[in-house]
UniProtKB/Swiss-Prot annotation:
EC number: 7.6.2.8
Organism expressing this protein natively: Escherichia coli (strain K12)
InterPro entries assigned: AAA+_ATPase, ABC_transporter-like_ATP-bd, ABC_transporter-like_CS, ABC_transptr_BtuD, Metal_Ion_Import_ABC, P-loop_NTPase
Protein name (record): Vitamin B12 import ATP-binding protein BtuD
GO CC annotations, alphabetized: ATP-binding cassette (ABC) transporter complex; BtuCD complex; cobalamin transport complex; extrinsic component of membrane; membrane
ATP-binding is among the record's keywords: yes
Assembly mode: The complex is composed of two ATP-binding proteins (BtuD), two transmembrane proteins (BtuC) and a solute-binding protein (BtuF).
Length: 249
Protein backbone atom coordinates (compact mmCIF):
# COMPACT_ATOMS: atom_id res chain seq x y z
CA UNK A 1 0.00 0.00 0.00
CA UNK A 2 1.25 3.47 -0.87
CA UNK A 3 2.17 5.94 1.86
CA UNK A 4 -0.31 8.83 2.17
CA UNK A 5 1.29 10.59 5.13
CA UNK A 6 4.77 10.39 6.65
CA UNK A 7 5.52 11.77 10.12
CA UNK A 8 9.10 12.40 11.23
CA UNK A 9 9.97 13.45 14.80
CA UNK A 10 6.64 15.24 15.23
CA UNK A 11 6.41 17.05 18.57
CA UNK A 12 4.42 19.78 20.33
CA UNK A 13 5.82 21.28 23.56
CA UNK A 14 5.34 18.75 26.38
CA UNK A 15 2.15 17.22 24.98
CA UNK A 16 3.45 15.17 22.08
CA UNK A 17 6.46 13.33 20.77
CA UNK A 18 8.77 13.27 19.20
CA UNK A 19 7.20 10.44 17.23
CA UNK A 20 7.45 9.09 13.71
CA UNK A 21 5.21 6.88 11.61
CA UNK A 22 3.39 6.48 8.34
CA UNK A 23 -0.21 6.26 7.17
CA UNK A 24 -1.01 4.03 4.21
CA UNK A 25 -3.73 4.13 1.59
CA UNK A 26 -6.54 1.63 2.05
CA UNK A 27 -5.97 1.04 5.76
CA UNK A 28 -7.67 1.87 9.04
CA UNK A 29 -5.20 3.04 11.68
CA UNK A 30 -6.34 3.41 15.29
CA UNK A 31 -4.73 5.70 17.85
CA UNK A 32 -5.21 4.17 21.30
CA UNK A 33 -4.04 5.02 24.79
CA UNK A 34 -5.27 6.53 28.05
CA UNK A 35 -6.69 10.01 28.44
CA UNK A 36 -3.97 12.59 27.96
CA UNK A 37 -1.93 10.27 25.73
CA UNK A 38 -1.82 12.84 22.92
CA UNK A 39 -4.30 11.31 20.49
CA UNK A 40 -6.31 14.49 19.88
CA UNK A 41 -3.16 16.61 19.71
CA UNK A 42 -1.67 14.26 17.13
CA UNK A 43 -4.83 14.18 15.00
CA UNK A 44 -5.06 17.98 14.96
CA UNK A 45 -1.42 18.15 13.88
CA UNK A 46 -1.98 15.57 11.13
CA UNK A 47 -5.00 17.56 9.95
CA UNK A 48 -2.85 20.67 9.53
CA UNK A 49 -4.70 22.55 12.25
CA UNK A 50 -1.60 23.13 14.40
CA UNK A 51 2.14 23.39 13.89
CA UNK A 52 5.21 22.35 15.83
CA UNK A 53 8.52 20.56 15.66
CA UNK A 54 9.23 17.80 13.17
CA UNK A 55 7.87 17.29 9.68
CA UNK A 56 4.77 15.81 8.07
CA UNK A 57 4.63 14.89 4.40
CA UNK A 58 1.14 14.54 2.93
CA UNK A 59 0.88 13.01 -0.55
CA UNK A 60 4.58 13.73 -1.06
CA UNK A 61 4.42 17.41 -0.08
CA UNK A 62 5.13 19.20 3.22
CA UNK A 63 1.83 19.55 5.05
CA UNK A 64 2.42 23.26 5.69
CA UNK A 65 2.69 23.86 1.92
CA UNK A 66 -0.96 22.92 1.38
CA UNK A 67 -3.50 25.72 1.16
CA UNK A 68 -6.63 25.34 3.28
CA UNK A 69 -8.79 25.00 0.17
CA UNK A 70 -6.63 22.30 -1.39
CA UNK A 71 -6.27 20.48 1.92
CA UNK A 72 -10.05 20.34 2.33
CA UNK A 73 -10.26 18.57 -1.02
CA UNK A 74 -7.76 15.86 -0.07
CA UNK A 75 -8.44 15.26 3.62
CA UNK A 76 -11.38 15.52 6.02
CA UNK A 77 -11.12 15.98 9.78
CA UNK A 78 -13.64 15.37 12.55
CA UNK A 79 -12.62 17.01 15.82
CA UNK A 80 -14.12 16.01 19.14
CA UNK A 81 -17.75 16.86 19.88
CA UNK A 82 -18.63 20.49 19.30
CA UNK A 83 -21.88 22.42 19.24
CA UNK A 84 -23.45 23.39 15.88
CA UNK A 85 -21.72 26.55 14.58
CA UNK A 86 -25.04 27.95 13.36
CA UNK A 87 -28.69 26.96 12.99
CA UNK A 88 -29.49 25.51 9.58
CA UNK A 89 -31.42 22.52 8.23
CA UNK A 90 -29.41 19.30 8.39
CA UNK A 91 -29.64 18.80 4.62
CA UNK A 92 -28.14 22.26 4.06
CA UNK A 93 -25.32 21.64 6.53
CA UNK A 94 -24.46 18.41 4.72
CA UNK A 95 -24.62 20.07 1.30
CA UNK A 96 -22.03 22.62 2.45
CA UNK A 97 -19.53 19.76 2.82
CA UNK A 98 -20.07 18.33 -0.66
CA UNK A 99 -17.66 19.28 -3.41
CA UNK A 100 -20.26 18.20 -5.98
CA UNK A 101 -23.49 19.66 -4.64
CA UNK A 102 -25.57 18.01 -7.38
CA UNK A 103 -25.06 14.56 -5.82
CA UNK A 104 -28.28 14.60 -3.82
CA UNK A 105 -28.62 10.82 -4.10
CA UNK A 106 -25.26 10.37 -2.37
CA UNK A 107 -26.33 12.71 0.43
CA UNK A 108 -29.50 10.68 0.89
CA UNK A 109 -27.54 7.40 0.87
CA UNK A 110 -25.07 8.54 3.53
CA UNK A 111 -27.83 10.08 5.64
CA UNK A 112 -29.82 6.86 5.37
CA UNK A 113 -26.84 4.72 6.36
CA UNK A 114 -26.51 6.76 9.56
CA UNK A 115 -30.28 6.77 10.25
CA UNK A 116 -30.64 10.48 9.53
CA UNK A 117 -33.38 10.19 6.89
CA UNK A 118 -36.00 11.79 9.11
CA UNK A 119 -33.62 14.45 10.43
CA UNK A 120 -32.75 16.18 7.15
CA UNK A 121 -35.35 18.91 7.58
CA UNK A 122 -34.59 19.53 11.24
CA UNK A 123 -32.42 22.43 12.38
CA UNK A 124 -28.94 21.54 13.60
CA UNK A 125 -29.57 23.29 16.93
CA UNK A 126 -32.55 21.02 17.64
CA UNK A 127 -30.60 17.75 17.56
CA UNK A 128 -29.56 15.51 20.43
CA UNK A 129 -25.87 14.89 21.05
CA UNK A 130 -25.95 11.56 19.23
CA UNK A 131 -27.88 12.98 16.29
CA UNK A 132 -25.46 15.87 15.92
CA UNK A 133 -22.50 13.48 16.06
CA UNK A 134 -24.00 11.45 13.21
CA UNK A 135 -24.61 14.61 11.18
CA UNK A 136 -20.96 15.62 11.66
CA UNK A 137 -19.85 12.14 10.60
CA UNK A 138 -22.06 12.24 7.51
CA UNK A 139 -20.57 15.64 6.63
CA UNK A 140 -16.94 14.47 6.63
CA UNK A 141 -17.87 11.30 4.73
CA UNK A 142 -19.58 13.40 2.04
CA UNK A 143 -16.55 15.69 1.92
CA UNK A 144 -13.99 12.96 1.31
CA UNK A 145 -15.75 9.94 -0.27
CA UNK A 146 -14.08 8.91 -3.55
CA UNK A 147 -17.56 8.37 -4.99
CA UNK A 148 -17.91 12.14 -5.38
CA UNK A 149 -14.40 13.40 -4.66
CA UNK A 150 -11.69 11.51 -6.60
CA UNK A 151 -9.03 13.63 -4.86
CA UNK A 152 -10.02 12.34 -1.40
CA UNK A 153 -7.14 10.55 0.32
CA UNK A 154 -7.32 10.84 4.10
CA UNK A 155 -10.03 10.83 6.77
CA UNK A 156 -9.07 11.81 10.34
CA UNK A 157 -11.58 11.09 13.11
CA UNK A 158 -11.25 12.07 16.77
CA UNK A 159 -13.34 9.65 18.86
CA UNK A 160 -16.01 9.19 16.17
CA UNK A 161 -17.91 6.58 18.20
CA UNK A 162 -18.80 9.08 20.93
CA UNK A 163 -22.57 9.32 21.57
CA UNK A 164 -23.36 6.47 19.14
CA UNK A 165 -25.32 3.40 20.18
CA UNK A 166 -24.28 -0.11 19.17
CA UNK A 167 -26.30 -0.13 15.93
CA UNK A 168 -24.99 3.29 14.92
CA UNK A 169 -21.41 2.22 15.63
CA UNK A 170 -21.92 -0.82 13.41
CA UNK A 171 -23.31 1.39 10.64
CA UNK A 172 -20.28 3.67 10.86
CA UNK A 173 -17.93 0.67 10.75
CA UNK A 174 -19.56 -0.43 7.48
CA UNK A 175 -19.12 3.04 5.99
CA UNK A 176 -15.47 3.25 7.05
CA UNK A 177 -14.76 -0.23 5.71
CA UNK A 178 -16.26 0.72 2.33
CA UNK A 179 -14.18 3.92 2.20
CA UNK A 180 -11.08 1.92 3.04
CA UNK A 181 -11.80 -0.54 0.23
CA UNK A 182 -11.99 2.44 -2.14
CA UNK A 183 -8.41 3.34 -1.19
CA UNK A 184 -8.97 5.96 1.50
CA UNK A 185 -6.62 6.09 4.50
CA UNK A 186 -8.50 6.39 7.79
CA UNK A 187 -6.95 7.42 11.11
CA UNK A 188 -9.15 7.49 14.19
CA UNK A 189 -8.77 7.65 17.95
CA UNK A 190 -10.52 5.05 20.07
CA UNK A 191 -11.01 4.13 23.72
CA UNK A 192 -12.55 0.74 22.89
CA UNK A 193 -9.63 -1.68 22.70
CA UNK A 194 -11.81 -4.58 21.55
CA UNK A 195 -13.20 -2.47 18.73
CA UNK A 196 -9.63 -1.73 17.66
CA UNK A 197 -8.70 -5.40 17.91
CA UNK A 198 -11.55 -6.24 15.55
CA UNK A 199 -11.66 -3.37 13.05
CA UNK A 200 -8.23 -1.70 12.79
CA UNK A 201 -5.54 -2.88 10.41
CA UNK A 202 -2.80 -1.21 12.44
CA UNK A 203 -2.59 0.66 15.73
CA UNK A 204 -0.39 3.23 17.44
CA UNK A 205 -0.33 2.91 21.23
CA UNK A 206 0.37 6.25 22.92
CA UNK A 207 1.08 7.33 26.47
CA UNK A 208 2.13 10.78 27.64
CA UNK A 209 2.64 11.90 24.05
CA UNK A 210 5.06 9.05 23.32
CA UNK A 211 4.61 6.09 20.98
CA UNK A 212 4.85 2.91 23.05
CA UNK A 213 4.16 0.53 20.16
CA UNK A 214 3.08 0.59 16.53
CA UNK A 215 2.26 -2.09 14.00
CA UNK A 216 -0.44 -4.65 13.31
CA UNK A 217 -3.29 -4.53 15.81
CA UNK A 218 -2.56 -7.93 17.36
CA UNK A 219 1.13 -7.04 17.74
CA UNK A 220 0.37 -3.74 19.48
CA UNK A 221 -2.56 -4.69 21.72
CA UNK A 222 -0.70 -7.23 23.81
CA UNK A 223 -1.18 -7.54 27.58
CA UNK A 224 2.40 -6.33 28.31
CA UNK A 225 2.02 -3.26 26.07
CA UNK A 226 -1.38 -2.41 27.51
CA UNK A 227 -0.14 -2.84 31.08
CA UNK A 228 2.60 -0.33 30.34
CA UNK A 229 0.12 2.14 28.84
CA UNK A 230 -2.73 1.86 31.32
CA UNK A 231 -1.01 0.71 34.51
CA UNK A 232 -3.27 -2.33 34.87
CA UNK A 233 -3.21 -5.96 33.82
CA UNK A 234 -4.97 -7.40 30.77
CA UNK A 235 -5.73 -10.83 29.36
CA UNK A 236 -6.42 -11.64 25.72
CA UNK A 237 -9.01 -14.33 25.11
CA UNK A 238 -10.27 -16.17 22.03
CA UNK A 239 -14.05 -16.53 22.12
CA UNK A 240 -15.77 -18.25 19.17
CA UNK A 241 -13.01 -17.16 16.82
CA UNK A 242 -12.90 -13.56 18.05
CA UNK A 243 -10.05 -12.12 20.10
CA UNK A 244 -11.10 -10.15 23.16
CA UNK A 245 -9.24 -8.13 25.77
CA UNK A 246 -10.34 -8.02 29.40
CA UNK A 247 -8.79 -6.22 32.33
CA UNK A 248 -7.86 -8.24 35.40
CA UNK A 249 -7.84 -7.20 39.02
Amino acid sequence: MSIVMQLQDVAESTRLGPLSGEVRAGEILHLVGPNGAGKSTLLARMAGMTSGKGSIQFAGQPLEAWSATKLALHRAYLSQQQTPPFATPVWHYLTLHQHDKTRTELLNDVAGALALDDKLGRSTNQLSGGEWQRVRLAAVVLQITPQANPAGQLLLLDEPMNSLDVAQQSALDKILSALCQQGLAIVMSSHDLNHTLRHAHRAWLLKGGKMLASGRREEVLTPPNLAQAYGMNFRRLDIEGHRMLISTI
